[in-house]
Amino acid sequence: MVDQNAAILVVDDVAENRDLLARRLRRLGLSRIDEAANGHEALAAIAKTPYDLVLLDIMMPELDGFGVLEALRADGRLNDLPVIVVSALNELDPVVRCIELGADDFIFKPFNPTLLRARVLATLEKKVLRDRTRDELKRKQAELNEARTLQLALVPPPFAGEAVGRQIAVAALLEPAKEVGGDLVDYFFIGDDQIVLALGDVSDKGAGAALMMARTHALFRALAARPDAPELFADPARAVGLVNEALARGNASCMFVTFALVSVDLATGVLAYVRAGHVPPYLARTDGSVARLGGGGGPALGIVEGFAYRADRAELTPGDRLLIVTDGFTEAQDPAGTLYGEAPIGELLAAGSGGQACLRSMVEAVRAFEAGEPQSDDMAAILLTFDVI
């Protein structure tokens, strides 16, 4: 159904032609009709009024129809403004040129009233559908932007302070590849002497992955609120096993989550960790060496119901830094398709310091390596500096 309030601009240097077109349009029930005698008047009118359709003559003095189309195309107005060319030139070349410049349709003079009616109404109907589609896309984009804001709000702020007599620093980072992503980064204290680091990567991307990420995040946070949380996270295999059961049971989406969970006893420096299909964490020592924590392995969460995960252990000494990343860093690609790899991450960790600046430098290094290639995967990282020297 065509909007009877549609605004139409008739552009022709001959007054009789403008009058004839206007009368035909009014017979269709369209009453909001303006006229312009040349291209300059047309552009001035279009700048002031949001028209729904322009009927444009080609051959006009001062500024012809080609010039009008070129001007509208240059400032992007043709994306929202349909134009029907009304031409006295019974040749295809000028019409083809107009279509290439962005016109939606054409009618030859002298025009057939039935054909004029059909093309005007069809173009206006397409305009309505196009506007609805544009508005729906804007609404969805606004929702995605809001979801991105909410997801980034889940990333905990940096921490620097004292715990059981030690100076602890934690930095976390999340860079979704799309508006929302499937990477999870979190840390929390349990009691006065235990900190838990969590990093996950959902197998998919976009809104579905973000929902899976939010569910996983909520499950771990729920465990952290239990009265037995200190004992539960002292052996992170127990916590990982419980979350895996919840995700694997009835997993109709077949999504899974690679996950690294690390629990650190701040009094002793002993850490226990589980890697559920995740990239091994990096451990940078004060002597400049960087080790990989390759133990504590098992399948990603949500795949094998009832799997018995086992934790592995390591020990932190003053000044050590523990880094966990998702494969959005290591599997970034340059224009030739070469992977960034895991080694450069360790080199940057060894050369840098702790804190948010270190994580940002890693992101910048990956961006430089990609050399303009679009980010293909979410990037998340968490960095713990133990007993800052």
Predicted regions and their residues:
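Acidic catalytic/metal-coordinating carboxylates
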Residues: 16, 37-41, 59, 64-70, ...
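… and, occasionally, acidic/histidine-rich disordered N-termini of signaling adaptors
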Residues: 134-321, 371-389
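Acidic, metal-coordinating helix/loop segments flanking the phosphotransfer/catalytic sites
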Residues: 35-53
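Two-component/phosphorelay signaling modules centered on CheY-like receiver
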Residues: 15-34
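Short amphipathic alpha-helix used as the core "switch/output" element in two-component signaling
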Residues: 44, 66-79
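C-terminal catalytic subdomain
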Residues: 312-324, 329-389
